Design a protein with these regions (language model features):
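N-terminal catalytic or cofactor-binding beta/alpha core of small enzyme domains
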Residues: 1-110
């Protein structure tokens, strides 16, 4: 059996978002596991995936150190970062990301 480690991150609740699904979904996946069926053609049948959920503070100063600590502790094969976009009407994949610290609202430290 192949074993894989995954880290899935989501942001803590913030102003205007009392419960952030971007952190609740990773927590649920970590607790419940991935739904592997007993069908012989299930691609996850011979794969054990351990999911580590990490809640990221809404803070420019603390977000990366929190995620980095989890990555170093768990040594994942994959890291999936999630977020909440109010205008989205479902699950969306980012086509590109910009490493730019800009926000309309202040972060948790301000």
């Amino acid at each position: 059996m192949r074993e894989h480690n995954a880290v899935i991150s989501g942001f803590d609740p913030y102003d205007g978002v009392g419960v952030n699904p971007a952190v609740e979904v990773p927590k649920a996946i970590a607790e419940q596991g991935l739904g592997v069926s007993s069908a012989p053609d299930d691609p996850l049948e011979q794969v054990a995936v351990t999911v580590h959920a990490v809640s990221i503070p809404v803070s420019f100063a603390k977000a990366w150190p929190t995620l980095k600590e989890t990555i170093e502790a768990t040594k994942p094969n994959i890291v999936i970062a999630t977020g909440l976009k109010h205008a989205a009407r479902g699950v969306m994949l980012e086509r590109c990301a910009t490493n730019l610290m800009d926000a309309i609202k202040p972060d948790a430290d301000n």
